[in-house]
Amino acid sequence: MNEAYVQIDCTEGVSYELREQFTFQVPGAQFTPQFRAKLWDGKIRLFNVRNRQIYRGLVPYIVKFCEERKYDWEYENEVYDEEFSLTEAEQFIKTLNLPDKIVPRDYQIDAFVHAIRTRRTLLLSPTASGKSLIIYLITRYLNVKRTLIIVPTISLVSQLATDFADYGFESDKYVHRIFGGQDKESDKPVNISTWQSLYKMPKKYFESFDLVIGDEAHQFKALSLTEIMTKLVNAKYRIGTTGTLDGTKTHKLVLEGLFGTVHKVVSTKELMDQKHLAEFNIKCLLLKHNDSICQAAKNFTYQQEIEYLVLNEARNKFIANLAMSLEGNTLLLYQYVEKHGKILHDIIKDRLPDYKIFFIHGGTDVEVREQTRSIVENEKRSIIIASVGTFSTGINIRNLHNIIFASPSKSRIRVLQSIGRGLRTSDTKDKAVLYDIADDMRYKKKENYTIKHFAERIKLYGEERFTFKIYKIELKG
Protein backbone atom coordinates (compact mmCIF):
# COMPACT_ATOMS: atom_id res chain seq x y z
CA MET A 1 0.00 0.00 0.00
CA ASN A 2 1.69 3.19 1.28
CA GLU A 3 3.01 4.75 4.49
CA ALA A 4 -0.50 5.64 5.71
CA TYR A 5 -2.41 2.37 5.22
CA VAL A 6 -1.92 -1.38 5.00
CA GLN A 7 -4.27 -3.72 3.17
CA ILE A 8 -5.29 -7.00 4.77
CA ASP A 9 -5.83 -10.10 2.64
CA CYS A 10 -8.30 -12.25 4.58
CA THR A 11 -11.57 -14.15 4.28
CA GLU A 12 -14.86 -12.27 4.40
CA GLY A 13 -15.63 -13.74 7.83
CA VAL A 14 -12.34 -12.51 9.29
CA SER A 15 -12.88 -9.07 7.74
CA TYR A 16 -16.14 -8.75 9.70
CA GLU A 17 -14.34 -9.89 12.85
CA LEU A 18 -11.74 -7.17 12.25
CA ARG A 19 -14.43 -4.57 11.71
CA GLU A 20 -16.02 -5.53 15.02
CA GLN A 21 -12.65 -5.53 16.80
CA PHE A 22 -11.80 -2.03 15.56
CA THR A 23 -15.21 -0.37 16.07
CA PHE A 24 -15.60 1.96 19.04
CA GLN A 25 -18.26 4.19 20.53
CA VAL A 26 -17.13 7.82 20.50
CA PRO A 27 -17.60 9.44 23.95
CA GLY A 28 -20.10 12.31 23.81
CA ALA A 29 -21.29 11.30 20.32
CA GLN A 30 -24.92 11.56 21.44
CA PHE A 31 -24.54 15.34 21.74
CA THR A 32 -23.42 15.88 18.12
CA PRO A 33 -25.83 17.21 15.45
CA GLN A 34 -25.07 14.21 13.19
CA PHE A 35 -26.11 11.74 15.90
CA ARG A 36 -29.24 13.69 16.79
CA ALA A 37 -30.22 13.84 13.12
CA LYS A 38 -29.68 10.05 12.93
CA LEU A 39 -26.99 10.52 10.26
CA TRP A 40 -24.37 8.74 12.41
CA ASP A 41 -24.55 5.95 14.98
CA GLY A 42 -21.82 7.50 17.17
CA LYS A 43 -19.23 4.84 16.33
CA ILE A 44 -15.83 5.08 14.70
CA ARG A 45 -14.68 2.18 12.49
CA LEU A 46 -10.95 1.94 11.97
CA PHE A 47 -11.07 -1.06 9.61
CA ASN A 48 -12.70 -0.61 6.20
CA VAL A 49 -14.45 -3.86 5.17
CA ARG A 50 -14.86 -2.76 1.54
CA ASN A 51 -11.21 -2.12 0.69
CA ARG A 52 -9.76 -4.09 3.66
CA GLN A 53 -7.57 -1.13 4.69
CA ILE A 54 -6.50 0.02 8.15
CA TYR A 55 -3.98 2.58 9.44
CA ARG A 56 -0.43 1.22 9.22
CA GLY A 57 0.27 2.23 12.82
CA LEU A 58 -2.25 -0.38 14.01
CA VAL A 59 -0.32 -3.36 12.57
CA PRO A 60 0.85 -4.47 16.08
CA TYR A 61 -2.83 -4.71 17.09
CA ILE A 62 -3.61 -6.79 13.97
CA VAL A 63 -0.79 -9.18 14.89
CA LYS A 64 -2.15 -9.44 18.44
CA PHE A 65 -5.66 -10.06 17.02
CA CYS A 66 -4.32 -12.98 14.94
CA GLU A 67 -2.25 -14.49 17.74
CA GLU A 68 -5.14 -14.39 20.23
CA ARG A 69 -7.29 -16.35 17.76
CA LYS A 70 -4.41 -18.60 16.62
CA TYR A 71 -4.82 -17.37 13.01
CA ASP A 72 -1.84 -17.79 10.68
CA TRP A 73 -0.49 -14.47 9.44
CA GLU A 74 2.27 -13.09 7.27
CA TYR A 75 3.38 -9.47 6.93
CA GLU A 76 4.64 -8.71 3.42
CA ASN A 77 7.33 -6.02 3.15
CA GLU A 78 7.71 -6.02 6.94
CA VAL A 79 9.89 -3.13 8.09
CA TYR A 80 12.33 -3.98 10.88
CA ASP A 81 13.59 -1.56 13.50
CA GLU A 82 16.63 0.54 12.63
CA GLU A 83 19.85 -0.24 14.46
CA PHE A 84 20.69 2.85 16.49
CA SER A 85 22.46 2.61 19.83
CA LEU A 86 22.55 4.95 22.80
CA THR A 87 26.28 5.46 22.17
CA GLU A 88 25.61 6.46 18.54
CA ALA A 89 22.95 8.90 19.74
CA GLU A 90 25.30 10.51 22.25
CA GLN A 91 28.05 10.81 19.64
CA PHE A 92 25.63 12.43 17.19
CA ILE A 93 24.44 14.93 19.82
CA LYS A 94 28.06 16.04 20.34
CA THR A 95 28.30 16.94 16.64
CA LEU A 96 25.37 19.38 17.00
CA ASN A 97 27.44 21.69 19.25
CA LEU A 98 24.43 22.56 21.39
CA PRO A 99 24.85 25.67 23.58
CA ASP A 100 26.36 24.94 27.03
CA LYS A 101 23.03 25.57 28.78
CA ILE A 102 21.29 22.90 26.65
CA VAL A 103 22.10 19.46 28.07
CA PRO A 104 19.79 16.67 26.86
CA ARG A 105 18.42 14.62 29.77
CA ASP A 106 18.57 10.82 29.79
CA TYR A 107 14.85 10.41 29.03
CA GLN A 108 15.10 12.85 26.09
CA ILE A 109 17.94 10.81 24.58
CA ASP A 110 15.98 7.57 25.18
CA ALA A 111 12.93 9.05 23.39
CA PHE A 112 15.13 10.21 20.49
CA VAL A 113 16.67 6.71 20.17
CA HIS A 114 13.24 5.03 20.32
CA ALA A 115 11.85 7.32 17.58
CA ILE A 116 14.79 6.66 15.24
CA ARG A 117 14.71 2.90 15.82
CA THR A 118 10.97 2.45 15.31
CA ARG A 119 10.41 5.17 12.63
CA ARG A 120 6.86 5.63 13.89
CA THR A 121 5.70 6.22 17.44
CA LEU A 122 3.56 8.39 19.69
CA LEU A 123 5.81 9.81 22.42
CA LEU A 124 3.84 10.33 25.63
CA SER A 125 5.76 12.98 27.51
CA PRO A 126 4.25 15.53 29.91
CA THR A 127 4.22 19.28 29.56
CA ALA A 128 7.56 20.93 30.37
CA SER A 129 9.53 17.74 29.70
CA GLY A 130 11.41 19.34 26.79
CA LYS A 131 9.59 17.87 23.78
CA SER A 132 10.98 20.55 21.45
CA LEU A 133 14.55 19.31 22.03
CA ILE A 134 13.47 15.73 21.27
CA ILE A 135 11.85 16.98 18.04
CA TYR A 136 15.02 18.91 17.17
CA LEU A 137 17.26 15.85 17.68
CA ILE A 138 14.99 13.69 15.49
CA THR A 139 14.81 16.35 12.76
CA ARG A 140 18.57 16.92 12.67
CA TYR A 141 19.52 13.23 12.77
CA LEU A 142 17.18 12.11 9.99
CA ASN A 143 18.07 15.20 7.93
CA VAL A 144 15.60 14.25 5.19
CA LYS A 145 14.93 16.39 2.15
CA ARG A 146 11.51 17.54 3.39
CA THR A 147 10.24 17.59 7.00
CA LEU A 148 6.76 18.67 8.09
CA ILE A 149 6.17 19.56 11.75
CA ILE A 150 2.48 20.12 12.57
CA VAL A 151 1.48 22.09 15.68
CA PRO A 152 -1.98 23.07 17.02
CA THR A 153 -1.55 26.86 17.40
CA ILE A 154 0.04 29.85 15.64
CA SER A 155 2.05 30.67 18.77
CA LEU A 156 3.70 27.25 18.65
CA VAL A 157 4.85 27.75 15.05
CA SER A 158 6.95 30.74 16.13
CA GLN A 159 7.98 29.20 19.43
CA LEU A 160 9.29 25.97 17.90
CA ALA A 161 11.27 27.87 15.24
CA THR A 162 12.70 30.07 18.04
CA ASP A 163 13.56 26.98 20.11
CA PHE A 164 15.44 25.51 17.12
CA ALA A 165 17.40 28.77 16.84
CA ASP A 166 18.19 28.58 20.58
CA TYR A 167 19.66 25.12 19.97
CA GLY A 168 22.03 26.61 17.38
CA PHE A 169 20.04 25.96 14.18
CA GLU A 170 19.84 28.61 11.46
CA SER A 171 16.05 28.78 11.60
CA ASP A 172 15.71 31.78 9.29
CA LYS A 173 17.67 29.91 6.62
CA TYR A 174 16.26 26.39 6.97
CA VAL A 175 12.82 26.69 8.60
CA HIS A 176 9.66 27.78 6.79
CA ARG A 177 6.78 28.92 9.03
CA ILE A 178 3.23 28.39 7.81
CA PHE A 179 0.20 30.03 9.43
CA GLY A 180 -2.60 32.37 8.41
CA GLY A 181 -1.90 33.85 4.99
CA GLN A 182 1.73 32.64 4.75
CA ASP A 183 2.86 30.95 1.53
CA LYS A 184 2.65 27.18 1.95
CA GLU A 185 5.27 26.40 -0.69
CA SER A 186 8.97 26.64 0.18
CA ASP A 187 12.35 25.15 -0.73
CA LYS A 188 13.40 25.12 2.94
CA PRO A 189 13.86 21.59 4.32
CA VAL A 190 11.94 22.09 7.59
CA ASN A 191 8.33 23.29 7.44
CA ILE A 192 6.43 24.14 10.66
CA SER A 193 2.69 24.66 10.26
CA THR A 194 -0.60 24.71 12.11
CA TRP A 195 -2.94 21.90 11.07
CA GLN A 196 -5.56 24.54 10.29
CA SER A 197 -3.34 25.90 7.49
CA LEU A 198 -2.90 22.55 5.75
CA TYR A 199 -5.85 20.20 6.10
CA LYS A 200 -7.55 21.44 2.92
CA MET A 201 -4.38 21.18 0.80
CA PRO A 202 -4.42 18.61 -2.04
CA LYS A 203 -2.68 15.24 -1.74
CA LYS A 204 0.03 16.36 -4.20
CA TYR A 205 1.28 18.96 -1.70
CA PHE A 206 2.12 16.29 0.90
CA GLU A 207 3.81 13.75 -1.37
CA SER A 208 7.31 15.27 -1.06
CA PHE A 209 7.53 14.95 2.75
CA ASP A 210 9.66 12.09 4.15
CA LEU A 211 9.25 12.92 7.86
CA VAL A 212 6.17 14.18 9.69
CA ILE A 213 6.11 15.17 13.36
CA GLY A 214 2.81 16.00 15.06
CA ASP A 215 3.56 18.08 18.15
CA GLU A 216 0.83 18.17 20.84
CA ALA A 217 -0.98 15.64 18.62
CA HIS A 218 -3.96 15.27 20.98
CA GLN A 219 -4.97 18.88 20.25
CA PHE A 220 -5.74 18.34 16.56
CA LYS A 221 -9.30 17.82 15.42
CA ALA A 222 -9.47 14.12 14.61
CA LEU A 223 -10.93 14.58 11.13
CA SER A 224 -8.43 17.29 10.14
CA LEU A 225 -5.45 15.32 11.44
CA THR A 226 -6.65 12.24 9.55
CA GLU A 227 -7.03 14.35 6.38
CA ILE A 228 -3.38 15.42 6.62
CA MET A 229 -1.81 12.17 7.82
CA THR A 230 -3.50 9.97 5.21
CA LYS A 231 -2.26 12.28 2.43
CA LEU A 232 1.35 11.86 3.65
CA VAL A 233 1.68 8.62 1.70
CA ASN A 234 5.49 8.80 1.38
CA ALA A 235 6.37 9.88 4.93
CA LYS A 236 7.98 6.74 6.34
CA TYR A 237 8.99 8.54 9.53
CA ARG A 238 5.93 9.46 11.62
CA ILE A 239 6.46 10.79 15.11
CA GLY A 240 3.71 12.16 17.35
CA THR A 241 4.27 13.86 20.69
CA THR A 242 1.59 14.37 23.30
CA GLY A 243 1.49 15.47 26.91
CA THR A 244 -1.64 13.51 27.69
CA LEU A 245 -4.28 11.28 26.13
CA ASP A 246 -7.93 11.87 26.95
CA GLY A 247 -8.38 8.47 28.59
CA THR A 248 -10.55 6.97 25.82
CA LYS A 249 -9.52 3.97 23.75
CA THR A 250 -10.82 5.61 20.55
CA HIS A 251 -8.59 8.65 20.92
CA LYS A 252 -5.51 6.53 21.66
CA LEU A 253 -6.06 4.11 18.77
CA VAL A 254 -6.69 6.82 16.18
CA LEU A 255 -3.44 8.57 17.16
CA GLU A 256 -1.53 5.27 17.24
CA GLY A 257 -2.94 4.39 13.83
CA LEU A 258 -1.74 7.68 12.34
CA PHE A 259 1.67 7.71 14.06
CA GLY A 260 2.61 4.49 15.89
CA THR A 261 2.28 2.78 19.24
CA VAL A 262 2.53 4.84 22.43
CA HIS A 263 5.92 5.09 24.12
CA LYS A 264 5.88 6.59 27.62
CA VAL A 265 8.89 8.87 27.97
CA VAL A 266 8.67 10.14 31.57
CA SER A 267 6.02 11.11 34.15
CA THR A 268 5.30 14.49 35.74
CA LYS A 269 6.02 13.01 39.18
CA GLU A 270 9.45 11.78 38.04
CA LEU A 271 10.27 15.23 36.66
CA MET A 272 9.27 16.87 39.95
CA ASP A 273 11.30 14.36 41.98
CA GLN A 274 14.33 15.09 39.78
CA LYS A 275 13.78 18.86 40.27
CA HIS A 276 13.31 19.39 36.52
CA LEU A 277 9.85 20.80 37.29
CA ALA A 278 8.74 23.31 39.88
CA GLU A 279 7.21 22.27 43.19
CA PHE A 280 3.49 22.51 42.53
CA ASN A 281 0.46 22.92 44.81
CA ILE A 282 -3.22 23.33 44.02
CA LYS A 283 -5.56 25.49 46.08
CA CYS A 284 -9.18 24.73 45.24
CA LEU A 285 -11.36 27.72 46.09
CA LEU A 286 -14.93 26.46 46.35
CA LEU A 287 -17.28 29.46 46.19
CA LYS A 288 -20.59 28.84 47.97
CA HIS A 289 -23.39 30.86 46.34
CA ASN A 290 -26.31 31.98 48.54
CA ASP A 291 -29.37 29.77 48.93
CA SER A 292 -31.76 31.97 46.95
CA ILE A 293 -29.40 31.80 43.94
CA CYS A 294 -29.01 28.02 44.33
CA GLN A 295 -32.78 27.57 44.40
CA ALA A 296 -33.24 29.74 41.31
CA ALA A 297 -30.39 27.96 39.51
CA LYS A 298 -31.54 24.40 40.17
CA ASN A 299 -33.21 24.16 36.76
CA PHE A 300 -30.50 26.00 34.79
CA THR A 301 -29.19 24.41 31.62
CA TYR A 302 -25.39 24.13 31.41
CA GLN A 303 -25.21 27.23 29.21
CA GLN A 304 -27.41 29.25 31.58
CA GLU A 305 -25.20 28.27 34.52
CA ILE A 306 -22.04 29.35 32.68
CA GLU A 307 -23.71 32.61 31.62
CA TYR A 308 -24.65 33.33 35.23
CA LEU A 309 -21.13 32.59 36.51
CA VAL A 310 -19.15 34.64 33.99
CA LEU A 311 -21.43 37.66 34.43
CA ASN A 312 -21.56 37.38 38.23
CA GLU A 313 -20.15 40.66 39.54
CA ALA A 314 -19.21 39.33 42.99
CA ARG A 315 -17.44 36.32 41.46
CA ASN A 316 -15.52 38.47 38.97
CA LYS A 317 -14.44 40.88 41.73
CA PHE A 318 -13.26 37.92 43.80
CA ILE A 319 -11.16 36.59 40.88
CA ALA A 320 -9.73 40.04 40.11
CA ASN A 321 -8.85 40.65 43.79
CA LEU A 322 -7.16 37.26 43.95
CA ALA A 323 -5.06 37.99 40.84
CA MET A 324 -4.06 41.41 42.17
CA SER A 325 -3.07 40.03 45.59
CA LEU A 326 -0.60 37.42 44.36
CA GLU A 327 3.16 37.87 44.28
CA GLY A 328 5.08 37.06 41.10
CA ASN A 329 3.71 36.53 37.58
CA THR A 330 0.12 35.31 37.30
CA LEU A 331 -1.68 33.62 34.40
CA LEU A 332 -5.46 34.08 34.61
CA LEU A 333 -7.26 31.70 32.23
CA TYR A 334 -10.80 32.38 31.01
CA GLN A 335 -13.06 30.88 28.34
CA TYR A 336 -15.19 33.68 26.83
CA VAL A 337 -13.43 36.80 25.52
CA GLU A 338 -16.14 39.50 25.56
CA LYS A 339 -18.38 38.03 28.27
CA HIS A 340 -15.63 37.24 30.75
CA GLY A 341 -12.01 37.97 29.79
CA LYS A 342 -12.63 41.60 28.91
CA ILE A 343 -14.60 42.17 32.13
CA LEU A 344 -11.77 40.74 34.26
CA HIS A 345 -9.19 42.76 32.32
CA ASP A 346 -11.12 46.01 32.77
CA ILE A 347 -11.55 45.48 36.54
CA ILE A 348 -7.83 44.78 37.04
CA LYS A 349 -6.61 47.48 34.64
CA ASP A 350 -8.82 50.06 36.33
CA ARG A 351 -7.42 49.17 39.76
CA LEU A 352 -3.77 48.80 38.63
CA PRO A 353 -3.28 51.29 35.78
CA ASP A 354 0.54 51.23 35.98
CA TYR A 355 0.87 47.47 36.33
CA LYS A 356 2.14 45.16 33.56
CA ILE A 357 -1.17 43.60 32.44
CA PHE A 358 -1.55 41.63 29.20
CA PHE A 359 -4.84 40.65 27.55
CA ILE A 360 -4.51 37.70 25.15
CA HIS A 361 -7.19 35.97 23.05
CA GLY A 362 -7.60 34.22 19.71
CA GLY A 363 -7.57 37.51 17.81
CA THR A 364 -4.29 38.68 19.36
CA ASP A 365 -1.50 38.94 16.79
CA VAL A 366 1.18 36.24 17.00
CA GLU A 367 3.95 38.84 17.40
CA VAL A 368 2.14 40.34 20.40
CA ARG A 369 1.90 36.90 22.02
CA GLU A 370 5.64 36.36 21.49
CA GLN A 371 6.42 39.81 22.94
CA THR A 372 4.26 39.03 25.99
CA ARG A 373 6.14 35.79 26.52
CA SER A 374 9.52 37.57 26.32
CA ILE A 375 8.49 40.42 28.65
CA VAL A 376 7.08 38.13 31.34
CA GLU A 377 10.26 36.02 31.37
CA ASN A 378 12.05 39.09 32.78
CA GLU A 379 9.26 40.49 34.98
CA LYS A 380 8.95 40.10 38.74
CA ARG A 381 5.22 40.86 38.88
CA SER A 382 2.70 40.90 36.04
CA ILE A 383 -0.72 39.50 35.11
CA ILE A 384 -1.56 37.73 31.84
CA ILE A 385 -5.31 37.46 31.26
CA ALA A 386 -5.55 34.84 28.52
CA SER A 387 -8.17 32.69 26.84
CA VAL A 388 -7.78 28.99 27.57
CA GLY A 389 -7.38 28.18 23.87
CA THR A 390 -4.37 30.46 23.39
CA PHE A 391 -2.39 29.82 26.56
CA SER A 392 -3.31 26.32 27.73
CA THR A 393 -1.28 24.69 24.95
CA GLY A 394 2.46 24.68 24.50
CA ILE A 395 3.22 28.33 25.30
CA ASN A 396 6.52 28.17 27.13
CA ILE A 397 6.79 30.75 29.95
CA ARG A 398 9.17 29.56 32.65
CA ASN A 399 8.68 32.55 34.92
CA LEU A 400 5.05 31.89 35.92
CA HIS A 401 4.34 31.67 39.65
CA ASN A 402 0.53 31.46 39.74
CA ILE A 403 -2.25 30.11 37.54
CA ILE A 404 -5.93 30.89 38.10
CA PHE A 405 -8.70 28.79 36.52
CA ALA A 406 -11.48 31.38 36.18
CA SER A 407 -13.66 29.17 33.94
CA PRO A 408 -14.85 25.65 34.79
CA SER A 409 -13.54 22.77 32.69
CA LYS A 410 -13.65 18.99 32.92
CA SER A 411 -11.45 18.32 29.89
CA ARG A 412 -8.60 16.14 31.10
CA ILE A 413 -6.31 17.36 28.31
CA ARG A 414 -7.07 21.05 28.80
CA VAL A 415 -6.63 20.92 32.58
CA LEU A 416 -3.27 19.11 32.37
CA GLN A 417 -2.03 21.39 29.60
CA SER A 418 -3.00 24.47 31.61
CA ILE A 419 -1.23 23.11 34.69
CA GLY A 420 1.83 22.62 32.53
CA ARG A 421 2.15 26.38 32.15
CA GLY A 422 3.23 26.58 35.80
CA LEU A 423 5.50 23.56 36.00
CA ARG A 424 8.59 24.99 34.34
CA THR A 425 11.43 26.23 36.53
CA SER A 426 13.44 29.44 36.05
CA ASP A 427 16.27 31.30 37.79
CA THR A 428 13.69 33.18 39.89
CA LYS A 429 11.17 30.40 40.46
CA ASP A 430 11.15 26.89 41.89
CA LYS A 431 7.50 26.60 42.96
CA ALA A 432 4.08 27.44 41.58
CA VAL A 433 0.46 27.45 42.74
CA LEU A 434 -2.75 26.74 40.83
CA TYR A 435 -5.91 28.43 42.12
CA ASP A 436 -8.82 26.31 40.91
CA ILE A 437 -12.03 28.32 41.28
CA ALA A 438 -15.15 26.17 41.59
CA ASP A 439 -18.78 27.04 42.28
CA ASP A 440 -21.07 25.30 44.76
CA MET A 441 -24.66 25.98 43.68
CA ARG A 442 -26.13 22.73 45.00
CA TYR A 443 -29.74 22.86 46.11
CA LYS A 444 -30.95 19.99 48.31
CA LYS A 445 -29.92 16.88 46.33
CA LYS A 446 -29.57 18.70 43.02
CA GLU A 447 -25.95 19.21 41.93
CA ASN A 448 -25.01 22.01 39.55
CA TYR A 449 -23.02 21.25 36.39
CA THR A 450 -19.79 23.01 37.34
CA ILE A 451 -19.50 21.28 40.71
CA LYS A 452 -19.62 17.99 38.79
CA HIS A 453 -16.79 19.30 36.61
CA PHE A 454 -14.90 20.23 39.78
CA ALA A 455 -15.29 16.64 41.02
CA GLU A 456 -13.73 15.43 37.74
CA ARG A 457 -10.76 17.78 38.24
CA ILE A 458 -10.27 16.61 41.85
CA LYS A 459 -10.23 13.02 40.61
CA LEU A 460 -7.61 13.98 38.02
CA TYR A 461 -5.42 15.76 40.61
CA GLY A 462 -5.49 12.60 42.71
CA GLU A 463 -4.56 10.38 39.76
CA GLU A 464 -1.66 12.68 38.85
CA ARG A 465 -0.53 12.76 42.51
CA PHE A 466 -0.67 16.55 42.79
CA THR A 467 -0.90 18.08 46.26
CA PHE A 468 -4.24 19.88 46.64
CA LYS A 469 -6.39 21.42 49.37
CA ILE A 470 -10.02 22.60 49.21
CA TYR A 471 -10.97 25.96 50.78
CA LYS A 472 -14.70 26.71 51.20
CA ILE A 473 -15.55 30.38 50.74
CA GLU A 474 -18.91 32.16 51.10
CA LEU A 475 -19.43 34.35 48.03
CA LYS A 476 -20.78 37.69 49.22
CA GLY A 477 -23.25 39.53 47.02
Regions found by a protein language model. Name each.
Residues 158, 173-186, 331, 342-343, ...:
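Conserved helicase ATPase core of P-loop NTP-dependent helicases/translocases
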Residues 266-331:
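Conserved interdomain linker/interface between the two RecA-like ATPase lobes of SF2 helicase motors
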Residues 180-211, 222-227, 390:
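Conserved helix/coil segment N-terminal to the catalytic DExD/H
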Residues 117-140:
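Walker A/P-loop
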Residues 211, 218-283, 461:
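Post-DEXD/H (motif II) to motif III coupling segment of the RecA-like Helicase ATP-binding lobe
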Residues 126-127, 146-157, 307-347, 461:
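Conserved strand-helix element at the start of the C-terminal RecA-like helicase core
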Residues 43-46, 76-124:
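Conserved pre-motif I regulatory segment
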Residues 244, 361-463:
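Conserved RecA-like P-loop NTPase helicase motor core
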